[in-house]
């Protein structure tokens, strides 16, 4: 039984991280409401929750600027427009590995191809 590897695009990974931060911040602040009898603990929960939500906003702004600089391409598998960050990425829709580097065509997909160490080789 062969294992099918599933890749996801970098933009979607970062957006998912920011969304998790929003929900984690809200849940943390809800924990502050549950501990309202212990005032100092409630304040800590609210501050941590607020910082998480603010950090998620910063991540969303950052990924928005990255998304504007990403190269738009048409996926050869699903023929939908997607964006690529780096030398290798995955389609946002069908998870198909993509590359714009002719040297990497036909080679097994690996995210290490985006690292600076690999580019120097």
UniProtKB/Swiss-Prot annotation:
Q: In which domain of life is the source organism classified?
A: Bacteria
Subcellular location, in the record's words? Cell membrane
Please give an example of a GO cellular component term from this record. plasma membrane
Main localisation:
membrane
Q: How does it sit in the membrane?
A: Multi-pass membrane protein
Q: Which residues form a coiled coil?
A: none
Could you confirm whether the keyword Ubl conjugation appears in this record? no
Q: Which UniProt keywords apply?
A: Cell membrane, Membrane, Transmembrane, Transmembrane helix
Q: What are the TM regions of this chain, as residue ranges?
A: 14-34, 43-63
| Disulfide-linked positions | none
Task: Give the matching HAMAP family.
Answer: UPF0295
For this chain, the family text in UniProt reads: Belongs to the UPF0295 family.
Q: What is this protein called?
A: UPF0295 protein OB0906
């Amino acid at each position: 039984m062969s294992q099918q590897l599933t890749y996801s695009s970098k933009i979607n990974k970062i957006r998912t991280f920011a969304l998790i931060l929003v929900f984690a911040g809200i849940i943390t602040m809800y924990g502050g409401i549950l501990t309202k009898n212990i005032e100092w603990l409630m304040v800590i929960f609210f501050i941590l929750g607020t910082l998480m939500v603010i950090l998620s906003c910063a991540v969303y702004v950052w990924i928005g600027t990255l998304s504007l600089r990403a190269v738009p391409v048409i996926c050869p598998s699903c023929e939908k427009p997607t964006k690529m960050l780096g030398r290798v990425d995955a389609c946002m829709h069908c998870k198909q590995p993509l590359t714009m580097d002719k040297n990497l065509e036909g080679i097994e997909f690996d995210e290490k191809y985006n690292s600076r160490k690999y580019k120097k080789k």
